[in-house]
Amino acid sequence: MSTIDRLKKTLNNETGAVISSPVNRRYFTGFPSSNGFLLVTTNSTVFLTDSRYLEAAEKSITVCPVDELIDAKRQIPEFFNEHKLNRILFESDRLYISDFERMKAFFDIKEPISDGSLDKAINEMRAIKNSFELECIKKAQEIAKNAFSYILGFIKDGVTEKQTALELDFFMLKNGAEALSFDTIVVSGKNSSLPHGVPSDK
């Protein structure tokens, strides 16, 4: 069962959901993008994204149809109106109140709901990893272990924190990492007391 199908089971015939955060859009579709909306009802789903991502999304996403995002103000209400839904759930954990208020007015949805119930359902789903996610975790762990072993042999007198951080990043990306979860922290000497220190020329 796909993650979208699992989400559908948390909805009822009177309720739909808008997934707008990049991290959850990717979780449900497998497709990374900086723009888009995943619209979900109990019996229908569509991923809307703009022309920059459209071709790649159509090739990559297999769990639901993909449509071009041209006019969100029109397309999103139309989708839910077609299914005769007025109660629409929005994410709250990853949505600023000001953004929710703008979206509520912008999309003209009769009963928008941002009470945490959608986030609770998604978080409970994400807490239980599927086989693909477990493989990704194992792969990331292996990359990190190999990178640490490699960088120990790279560090020597005269090599700066910045050089070490760049070498570490390059090794991980060259050996299977898609991207960095956060900026690599490489600090030494007196900088070692900084848990979120920025690599320097030291």
Where are these regions (language model features)?
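Terminal domain-start leader segments
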Residues: 1-48, 54-55, 77, 81-85, ...
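Short helix/loop capping segments that flank catalytic or ligand/cofactor-binding pockets
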Residues: 27-28, 56-57, 98, 194-197
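A generic local secondary-structure boundary/capping motif
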Residues: 27-28, 36, 126, 173-176, ...
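Short, solvent-exposed amphipathic alpha-helical segments in soluble enzyme
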Residues: 33-37, 62-64, 104-106, 202
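Divalent metal-coordination and catalytic microenvironments
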Residues: 38, 137, 186
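Compact, glycine/acidic-enriched structural inserts
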Residues: 49-78
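Flexible, acidic/His-enriched mid-domain "rim/lid" segments that flank
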Residues: 71-180, 191
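Acidic, glycine-rich loop-and-beta core segments that form the ion-binding/anion-interacting portion
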Residues: 179-202
